[in-house]
Amino acid sequence: MPRYTESEWLTDFIIDALDSGRFWGVGWLDEQKRIFTVPGRNRRERMPEGFDDFYEAFLEERRRHGLPEIPETETGLGCFGRLLRTANRARQERPFTIYKGKMKLNRWIMTPRPYKGCEGCLVYLTQEPAMKNMLKALFGIYPHDDKHREKALRRSLRKKAQREAARKQAAAVATPTTSSAAEVSSRSQSEDTESSDSENELWVGAQGFVGRDMHSLFFEEPEPSGFGSSGQSSSLLAPDSPRPSTSQVQGPLHVHTPTDLCLPTGGLPSPVIFPHETQGLLAPPAGQSQTPFSPEGPVPSHVSGLDDCLPMVDHIEGCLLDLLSDVGQELPDLGDLGELLCETASPQGPMQSEGGEEGSTESVSVLPATHPLESSAPGASVMGSGQELPDLGDLSELLCETASPQGPMQSEGGEEGSTESVSVLPATHPLESSAPGASVMGSSFQASDNVDDFIDCIPPLCRDDRDVEDQEKADQTFYWYGSDMRPKVLTATQSVAAYLSKKQAIYKVGDKLVPLVVEVYYFGEKVKTHFDLTGGIVICSQVPEASPEHICQTVPPYKCLLPRTAHCSVDANRTLEQTLDRFSMGVVAIGTNMGIFLKGLLEYPAYFVGNASRRRIGKCRPLSHRHEIQQAFDVERHNREPEGSRYASLFLGRRPSPEYDWDHYPVILHIYLAPFYHRD
């Protein structure tokens, strides 16, 4: 998390020099991407007049802020580059050196930083911790610093050395009649004690859960249940959750941080590739052999029809529609649903059965391309693949390839098999909101069972699929945009369990993050539909425009920005502007397999309507001002009473009343769980 620093004068000096244009070789190369150039020294050519003016002005500004003089052996160019890197104000852009005629220029890309006097930066620094704290409170997970583990390891090694020294000293003064067997027994007991002490120090967090009745889902083994079997399915991006694998976890996952996602280097940024073993995702359950499909052999019982993943496919289509509307392109013809399933990157190639009919794809990873604040031309390379990202005109080429060693498995009948492992990466939405009135792609199925199938394909947040004997002391992992969250102390878990036990309205929080869909209405007219792939979002209005070096001008993928559009009425425009200005802090929304949870960051009243409260189903409830977690939608209650609303409504500006129509309220937000949005 970036914090305020004392080097803001450096950024102010650079921005003033770039905007004024009074120095030779200093200017914006791409202002939207924050890439600028400064003069570089070419020792083979005669430097033009005024080459050193920029660096002399930089040294003068440095003296004015009380910094010491540079050594005689250092130049202004070297001091400028060193200060940029140490203050983390900019980094070198590749290629670093370009030429303007015969003169050399150095390229830098500015790193966005928070500013003390900027209200938007304050909002940015408030929203991300609020999101993380809400996730910690809901799931009873607290961040774990690796330094604590390193300290525990060093402490255990130090104690081990002390015990070894004491044992040698005792052996030196012992009588010669001591038998070798006794020494071996003493040494064995000492090593067992050391090993036990070390394990107690290293795994105290993982074994410290006490609220087993509330968090028992974190410790139970997954039960295979067809398409939703967590032993064979990856996540529909729960960005915090580890990829489940029947093999041992190879290492922590790496996810782009919000700051990294907003620093493109050119073209479409590369999607994030998770460094995990895909072979582990395809490993069969315990007691089953890994045999490929064949026309003669039986079809495994855990394979279901492709219709089970239709809700997920519709959500992916909606996300791509939202992405294409943001970059100003039309949605291509999707064609047959089979085009949505990508080919595998297998060295043997696809396995064809009789008739060349398509079968089941055991692991599919759909990666919607992230894009910068402005629309870019396609053609950026995909990270880790060495290939260029194709044009968005063909949807099938957008889909990533799997790493299955057998390739796509085929079967008879020409029916498409089930997608057993699907992974979707979050898309970074640009600062400009999508065009009002964007159409939403509907689905063509009616079965309510697909809602459960959609949720079942998402694995639990906190589970390591290791051996049964190692499950009790397994390191509980939980990732959220690159932040490693693990159980830290026992008292913290106890306090969270006690807090949730007192909240009668929140008796179940679930164990899976489920994507959300947000519909935005201004005076009864729908202006935007936001498709989320993270399971946790911050809904807020756009912050005021500022210089591109401000961190508030970056839009992380977990943020849903309300567009600023004009209304036909002058009074309505004024009311809408006032409402959006007061909604800059926003509301945090978390979707799980048990419902939708809200936490308001606002300082003025807001109201929501949902079915979570048994006594106030369909009635207005005020959103708490104390950053308190409130449940707005309950999945189990909706399943028992399906005639109710499928979403939670959030009203801004006016208190909802039955005597007013929708066009009376400035802003109304409908928040859906993705499977309920695509169900009808």
UniProtKB/Swiss-Prot annotation:
Q: Which residues bind DNA?
A: 7-103
Name the major location. Answer: host cell
One Gene Ontology term of the biological-process aspect is: symbiont-mediated suppression of host type I interferon-mediated signaling pathway
Q: Where is the composition biased (Acidic residues)?
A: 191-200
**Keywords per UniProt:** DNA-binding, Host cytoplasm, Host nucleus, Host-virus interaction, Inhibition of host innate immune response by virus, Inhibition of host interferon signaling pathway by virus, Inhibition of host IRF3 by virus, Inhibition of host PKR by virus, Inhibition of host RLR pathway by virus, Interferon antiviral system evasion, Modulation of host cell apoptosis by virus, Transcription, Transcription regulation, Viral immunoevasion
Signal peptide annotation: none
CC annotations in GO: host cell cytoplasm; host cell nucleus
- Where is this protein localized, as stated in its record? Host nucleus; Host cytoplasm
Impact upon substituting residue 85 to A: About 50% loss of transcriptional regulation and DNA-binding
Q: Where is this region: Disordered?
A: 156-201, 220-257, 343-365, 403-423
Bias (Low complexity) occurs at 168-188, 220-240
Which Gene Ontology terms cover its molecular function? Answer: protein serine/threonine kinase inhibitor activity; transcription cis-regulatory region binding
Give the consequence of mutating residue 82 to A.
Answer: About 50% loss of transcriptional regulation and DNA-binding
Q: How does it assemble?
A: Interacts with host EIF2AK2/PKR. Interacts with host USP7.
Q: What does this protein do?
A: DNA-binding transcription factor that plays a role in the modulation of host immune response. Acts by interacting with host EIF2AK2/PKR and inhibiting its activation. In turn, EIF2AK2/PKR substrates including EIF2S1 or histone H2A are not phosphorylated. Inhibits type I interferon signaling by targeting host IRF3 during viral reactivation from latency. Attenuates the transcriptional activity of host FOXO3 via activation of the AKT1 signaling pathway, inhibiting FOXO3-mediated apoptosis.
Q: Tell me which family the UniProt entry assigns to this protein.
A: Belongs to the IRF family.
| Protein name in UniProt | Viral IRF2-like protein
The species is Human herpesvirus 8 type P (isolate GK18) (HHV-8)
Q: Which gene encodes it?
A: vIRF-2
